[in-house]
A protein has these predicted regions:
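Acidic/histidine-rich catalytic cores of soluble enzymes
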Residues: 159-198
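Active-site groove signature of glycoside hydrolases
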Residues: 125-141, 162-173
Length: 198
């Protein structure tokens, strides 16, 4: 178990160094790689109940869990007020940190956005990954970005109300944020305390 943890941490450090390019190095006087927590995205454990999931993560040496709180996830949005506290309790009882959840939130006016944000804030969870945004093929790229800029502005406002941070995960391909310059346009006027990119 310990060698797996070291492999994950060392690999993450190496990949980070490669990704950030020249001029970035780990200093022996700086952050110790052993102090970097390793979290697991729980999507692959959705077949387990909360206690079983927590036991597996603890047995495998993970420090934290990015819990799937979305359609098809461990916690369904319609059950968030009841099930998220149960999931967090099981994780924390197993010594697993729950500082982030993964959601499908991409609309501040969706019926589940506020209940999810309230539930996570009540549990002391400060970060969530929000859902993807798609381009409307009937609109130009600049028109799409202007529409999504309004979405980011509204999500920032709702996040501020609950004291949480939403991070957009960009993926390559045809989704908004695939070309990373989209994100500059969407985030340049936003407060990074409440909204950003993961």
């Amino acid at each position: 178990m310990n060698s797996r943890r070291n492999f994950i941490r060392t690999s993450a450090a190496g990949i980070t160094g490669i990704t950030l390019g020249q001029g970035f190095t780990f200093s022996s006087s700086g952050t110790n790689i052993k102090d970097m927590p390793v979290h697991a995205f729980t999507k692959c454990l959705q077949f387990l109940d909360f206690d079983e999931m927590s036991e597996v993560l603890a047995a495998r040496g993970f420090d934290g869990a990015d819990l799937a709180v979305r359609p098809g996830g461990q916690v369904l949005p319609e059950n968030v007020a009841v099930d998220l506290p149960k999931a967090v309790k099981a994780l924390r009882n197993a010594g697993i940190d729950t500082s982030m959840i993964v959601t499908a939130i991409n609309n501040p006016d969706d019926q589940f956005t506020r209940p999810i944000l309230k539930s996570m804030a009540d549990l002391g969870i400060k970060n969530y990954r929000f859902g993807y945004l798609d381009y409307d093929n009937k609109l130009s790229v600049p028109e799409n970005l202007e529409l999504h800029k309004i979405t980011f502005e509204k999500l920032e406002k709702v996040n501020r109300e609950y004291g949480v941070h939403g991070g957009y995960q960009n993926h390559s391909g045809r989704r908004v944020g695939g070309p990373v310059w989209d994100l500059y346009h969407l985030l340049k006027d936003r407060n990074p305390e409440f909204i950003g990119v993961q």
